[in-house]
Structures are given as C-alpha cells and as structure tokens.
Amino acid sequence: MQENYKAKAYDILKNLNIEEGDLIEIKKGDLRIRGILLPSYSKDERIFVIKLDNGYNIGISIDNISEIKLITKNSSKAQESERKEVSRNGAKSEIKIISTGGTIVSKVEYETGAVRPALTTEEIVQFLPEINEIAKVDAEVLFSILSENMKPEYWVKIAESVKKAFGEGNTGVVIAHGTDTMAYTASALAFSLRSLQGPVVLVGSQRSSDRPSSDSAINLLSAVTTAKYAPFGEVVVNMHADSSDTYALVHRGVKVRKMHSSRRDAFQSVNDKPLAKVLWKERKLVMLDKSYMSKKGETTLDAKFDNRAFLLYYYPGLDRDFLEHILTNTKIRGLIIAGTGLGHTSSDYVELFRKATKDGIFIGMTTQCLFGRVNMNVYTTGRQLLDAGVTPLEDMLPEVALVKLMWVLAHEQDLEKIRSLMISNLVGEINPRHTLDLFPRWSYE
C-alpha cells in the first residue's frame, strides 16, 4: 500500500514493490538510513517518512537518493485480515487500549501541523506497526481531555471500562493518559479495581509525536509489552526511563510521581522500587521486585469517590483565618496536610485541628519531603498534633493520600472507621520497610 504517497515518490515505491510497513534502506550521499516506511501526510510529494530503530520518525527527501533497497516485507501484512476482525470484535483482542487524552497515541496531520488522537485499532497499528509483534490490540477512545481537566467522575468511567475490558476476555489493559495527573488516576484505579485479572498499565508521552525526541512510540510499545507479559494484577505506570532510549520502567501506581516538568524520564518511584524494567527493542519484561499482587480470577469494581477533601501544602505564615474558614465554612470532610519534615505544621493550628477532628473531620499528615515517612512522636509539635487528632500516614505520597481519602470518604461516615482505612495498607500505598537504596543520590562528579 503506497496510497499516501504521490507522484515520483509513489512511482519509486511501486516499481520496487515497497509498501508502508516494509523495512527499507536508503542511501543518500555517505549516509545509509534503515527503517520502516510510514504513511506520509505531507503536502511535499518528495518526502519519505521513515521510523528509525530508535523509535524516532524522520522525513527524507527523494532528491539525491542514490539507492533504495527493500530489506524485509512488513510481517504484519499477513495479520491484516485478523487485525480487522480484532477491531470489530474486542473479545478477540489480547490487550485493550483505552484512550483518555494526551499525545501518547496520536498522528500528525502535516498539512496543518496539528496532532490528533489515533482513533481506531487500524490507526494505532499504522502509527506503530511493531505492536502486532507483541499482541492483538483493540482500541477505544473513552474521552479526549487534557489531563488537568481530569475529575473523580472520569476515574469512575475509566474503572468501569477496565472492568468491561477484562470481562470481554482481554488479559491486560493499557490506558493512554496525559502525564500531568496520571499519578492521581493511577491511584484512583488502584483503590477502585481489586483482584485484578491482569495488569492495568497507564502510559503517556512527555513529548508529542510531531517532535523528533518524542517518547510516544517507545512508551506505547513498552506499555503493551507490560500488559502482555507482566505476571502481576496491579495498576502501574509505564514510562520512559533513560536518555539513551534503551528501556522503560514500570512503577506501582500508588508509589509513583511525576518529578520533572519536561524530561522524558520524569516519572520516578518514591519510597519504593520500580516493579519491572521493559527492554522495548527485545519486547522483554524484566521483573525488579517480586513483592507484587498476583493475578486473580475476576476483577472487582468499587469505584466511588467523595471529593469533599482538601490537600493543604503547609508553609510558614499560613493564615489562621483562612485555614479556619476551610475547616468550618465549607463542606469539607477530610484534610490531607503536606507537612514539613517528619510531619509538622505550626503549633498555632493545633486547637483548630482539635476542634475539626471532634466535629468528625479527618485530618491526615504526609510529608513535603516525599521521600521518607512521617514520625510525629519525635518533636513536641508533632506530639501536640497527634493529641489533637491528626493521623500520621506513614510514607504515603500527599497526592495518593488525597485520592485514597476521597475513596474512603465515599465508603465510610464514621471517623474512626475512616482512620482505620487510611492507615491500612490496601494496595501497596504504604511501604513498611525502607532501605537506603530507595533514596536517589545525584552525582556531581
């Protein structure tokens, strides 16, 4: 199929019996460029689009090309009719890809420069032909939103779609999601989906597919590899891990955080090790941690959230009246504090917290340090906060604690029952044992 190419480029491909998806080699001057021929959406009829071995896409002008050689035909062509059947019948797929937004599954419209989602199974396979080498996939666009617009009601819809996907016979689920709030959604799904039949893999892209340094292809291939081969039944985040494009890491969904605004390896496990490493070129999953939740027989759905919760990042000079207003003049049922150090705020607020907990409002303490756990028994202020009813939340990340609280509030009304659930390790959100290697050390040599 050369239908996306025109004029001279089309004639060259037709004469050589080269089709989209074939592995070819182009000689231009002293350069030899090898890669998979992709569809071209450019108005320039002299451009070939090639996917390199490192996952990047490049455009090559036909001008001054001395040789074009077919290396191997597209191995997925033989699977084309089967793939079309898969797209019509999700039950025949192995891996379900659910798109919620972001640029991880997208295609460039070169006429406008715009990037739009690849909406169908065929488009995803066209975008990434290698995916057929891993598993049969079926794609669904649940919604297409910017991740900063994610809401608890959307978490419920995603969880329902995951449950449905497993019910259709899929053995793993990949969720395409914007990176900014991916960790929140991962936590929400972890609390909402229990006894998972297989992996639920959230994946995103830090750089869209129209950029030469895009991580879209590597991340999606890695995510499908994880969904196909992982032995666990957990919600995880699968993202790029190194600047050399050699592997991706699989992070437990309740122990991961986006730690850089733009780097491709922005996601890091916090107070925990990654569960696995994905060698995407080899289509291989290497387990790094054996303490995972095994796959179960049938997935249980329990997706309810009460968003009458608030995440407070404490800072010196926090206005007492402002805090009092939040605790007394709103519908708030729970407060998560990102406190300093071992879990502190100014002692000026102790009595406010005491009154709030007596009124049935849950107050939980996490640390702004992120790494390490809270220990409110060490210093006087911490002990005062404990006496006022503030609950220490071990090594939980502030965002995870917030999502967990929303889930707990939707299930319990009694403060003591809420406290009991919040300090219980439900899905691996609390790591009872920290080792020295859990803290990253930066080298300045």
From Swiss-Prot:
Reactions the enzyme catalyzes: L-glutamyl-tRNA(Gln) + L-glutamine + ATP + H2O = L-glutaminyl-tRNA(Gln) + L-glutamate + ADP + phosphate + H(+)
Keyword terms, alphabetized: ATP-binding, Ligase, Nucleotide-binding, Protein biosynthesis
Source domain of life: Archaea
Claim: Nucleotide-binding is one of the keywords in the record: yes
TM regions (residue ranges): none
Catalytic site positions: 103, 179, 180, 258
Any GO BP annotation: translation
Keyword Transcription annotated: no
Oligomer and partners: Heterodimer of GatD and GatE.
PANTHER family associated with the record: 60 KDA LYSOPHOSPHOLIPASE (PTHR11707:SF28), L-ASPARAGINASE (PTHR11707)
Official protein name in the record: Glutamyl-tRNA(Gln) amidotransferase subunit D
Organism the protein comes from: Saccharolobus islandicus (strain L.S.2.15 / Lassen #1)
